[in-house]
Amino acid sequence: MFFRPCVHTVGRYSRARVPGLLSSLFFYRSCNNVLTNSLPTVTTAGRVSRYGYICRRSSTSAAERGVFLPFALTCRRNIHSIHEDEKKLERWKKIEESHPLDELVLDSVVKVFSNSTEYSKSKPWKTLDQKSSRGTGFAIAGRKILTNAHVVMAMNDHTFVDVKRHGSQIKYKAKVQKISHECDLAILEIDSDEFWKGMNPLELGDIPPLQEVVSVVGGENICITKGLVLRVETRIYDYSDSDLLSIQIDATINDENSGGPVIMGNKVVGVVYEIGFVIPTPIIKHFITSVQESRQYSCFGSLDLSYQSLENVQIRNHFKMSHEMTGILINKINSSSGAYKILRKDDIILAIDGVPIGNDEKVPFQNKRRIDFSYLVSMKKPGEKALVKVLRNGKEYEYNISLKPVKPNFTVQQFYNVPSYYIFGGFVFVPLTKTYLDSEHHQVKISERLADDINEGYQSLYGAQVEKVNGVEVKNLKHLCELIEECSTEDLRLEFKNHKVLVLNYESAKKATLQILERHKIKSVISKDICLPMLLDDPFKDNKINLLPWSVLPLMFDFS
């Protein structure tokens, strides 16, 4: 008589009573049953899980008779699954043999609470709903707390941050001293001596070797998980779209782990920033050094150009590269780049600071590893120079190029201070990209059209980038304001990067602007941070209010 095991069946499959470590997706195949030779061989997929026995109802007459085939008689594990389980056993053995964390390490880890109000991207004079965020941080030298930028979210007057020590119920007020959204890091200051009592700063270590065991610390009530280092490479940070060095680990990342330290041997080897990914210590040290040296908001250099690999021998021959030469081909150099008008399209970059670049766009790194060449540039600060060796028309040249800051894929005003804006004719002009906040050159775009008869028919200009005002190339938002305020022609003409044109009657647009401000309860045509020469004088001097520039008037009245 056939013995039918007692199992908990879910659908066509049941749960196997095997160790959780062996849980994995695999393929199994039924074999001829000892009770009947009529069963065919069928291949299907299943999952070994923690409870019960895996069984499969036969698709033939045995199924009609309700016969269940035990796992031992009907399934064979494939070789790949066995090897995978052996790797898992080795992994867990390595993790179990690792040393527990020192209690002093845990005492240096804190909980971070942040509440921030963002400004509207399209209407920068308006604030949006308050957002709350929680994460982890840890003490570093100088009575500072290091955490993720996305945990504190912003660095402005509308951001409020509290921290709480491990095992304590008291929250302490913190101030964001420095934030870098490029590398997703922020430094907090806490003035309370009580908070720092008995807290030791954690020491920063080096990049961990592959397959080394690391501990991830953070989350609610200090959760500790362990895993192995899988790879070290440059990677696009999702938060900022910056291409920087990163470490991938297989340790479980729990809720609110962001900003927590990754520990190896009681030293910090990284900061958690995404699920499975860690900011390595070279990036952390570079960020901290930049904080001490400068108040710049960007601390990573960039050549700001487009390029491609040269792995195909035909393209290398076309550009007269010798057999031993390797490098990358420049496709485009952006006008904001320090290499603009120095390097050229179709130049071959052979080396940076004496380090040869491979045809695969990579350079040598630690322990025979290779990473993207951008690492050489990003680990320099904006304003520093890089020695770039290029091949041009078969001849080699070297240039010292001043690096520009990395430009993340977001508008700076959202994160740092009260947004900059200027309104004219119902069009809202804002900075387009993140550079230095005091940069002499940045792009300007239209973020919103406040509907009015004066701007009817110009709906397609939303998001358009301004190139010229009355034939003069626009340098930045302040320059655009000056060009519009000082307009002496009957018509104001704006030209855009997409080749579209905006023409407004200047006097009519000025009158319409004041009406638009009152209609939308906007206090000013211009943000406070943009200081035009015409606004520096006392507007009530000699009571000559009628001689004031027209745009000063909204600054005197509160329409709310």
Swiss-Prot record:
InterPro entries linked: DEGP_PDZ, DEGP_PDZ_sf, PDZ, PDZ_sf, Peptidase_S1_PA, Peptidase_S1C
One CC-aspect GO term: mitochondrial membrane
Domain of life: Eukaryota
Tagged with keyword Nucleus: no
Active-site residue list: 150 (charge relay system), 184 (charge relay system), 258 (charge relay system)
Region spans: Serine protease: 117-302
Any one of the GO BP annotations: proteolysis
Keyword entries, A-Z: Hydrolase, Membrane, Mitochondrion, Protease, Serine protease, Transit peptide
EC number(s) per entry: 3.4.21.-
A Gene Ontology molecular function term of the record: serine-type endopeptidase activity
Function: Putative serine protease.
Protein name: Putative protease Do-like 11, mitochondrial
UniProt organism field: Arabidopsis thaliana (Mouse-ear cress)
